[in-house]
Amino acid sequence: LDPIDHAVDIPIYQDKTPLHFINIGDRDCNIELTSYCIKNINPQYEYKINDGEWLKYKVYNSYNIMYPNGCQEHNPIILHPNDTLYFRGSRLDQIDKSYLYFIMQDGSSIEVRGNIHSLLKPDEFYYITDLNDYGIYTFYSLFYHCKSLINAPQLYAHILSASCYEKMFIGCDGIKNSPVIHTLKLASSCYRDMFIYCDKLTNTPLLSTSKLEPSCYYRMFYECTSLKEIKLSFDDNDKYIKK
């Protein structure tokens, strides 16, 4: 596409770097990307470490009626201290409860940076603003119990889809600061249980209270025991609700 043709549509604030993890700790950390897909459709992903070449990545499906306790096959990538791991690819179209999630070894210190939309398409992901184009459960449980994660990536989408960020950071008890969000239109259960059990979280993004959708903020900060206040927007005026 000619950039001139759609330059007015691109959010200039979107990071053009693919989603990536940086090991800032002093020990190796295993990281893998796994899918939960009832229809067993294999998404296509690539990864690279530091300035290396992009390599194909096998995403195993954890949904299997033969193995009700979870995935029996794994594809971990060893991330050494000071190394950076990049991911990009094409997410499967979702018409049911299917999603991708990371498995991360405990006991490390991992920063996440870049544009999370590189998990939706491998190129020009920085044009994405409407998550409805990628189905429901877009980033559902993406960092499920990734206890080595110490921060959250910026969330660029303007228009959310149902359950898109539901349980996204559940159990990520290393995160202290909430991500910057750019939401203009909510969806049902979009932020449901998003930070549940993030007991080190100390702040929240500014949350809109106009045009709410069913369960959009339901238990968003449940058991966030370090949180003292939640920042809400009423008629374009910032307000605070104490814990």
Segments (PLM) and residue ranges:
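Short beta-strand segments and strand-loop junctions that repeat across beta-rich extracellular domains
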Residues: 42-56
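Solvent-exposed serine/threonine-rich low-complexity stretches and specific carbohydrate-binding patches
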Residues: 52-68
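Register-specific detector for alpha-helical tandem repeat solenoids, activating on a conserved position
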Residues: 140, 166, 192-193, 218-219
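Non-cytosolic beta-sheet module surface loops
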Residues: 23, 33-40, 89-91, 156, ...
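Structural signature of tandem-repeat unit edges
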Residues: 1, 9-10, 14, 19-21, ...
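Noncatalytic modules at the cell exterior or secretory-pathway interfaces
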Residues: 29-31, 75-92
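A short beta-strand element within beta-rich, extracytoplasmic domains
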Residues: 16-40, 84, 123-130
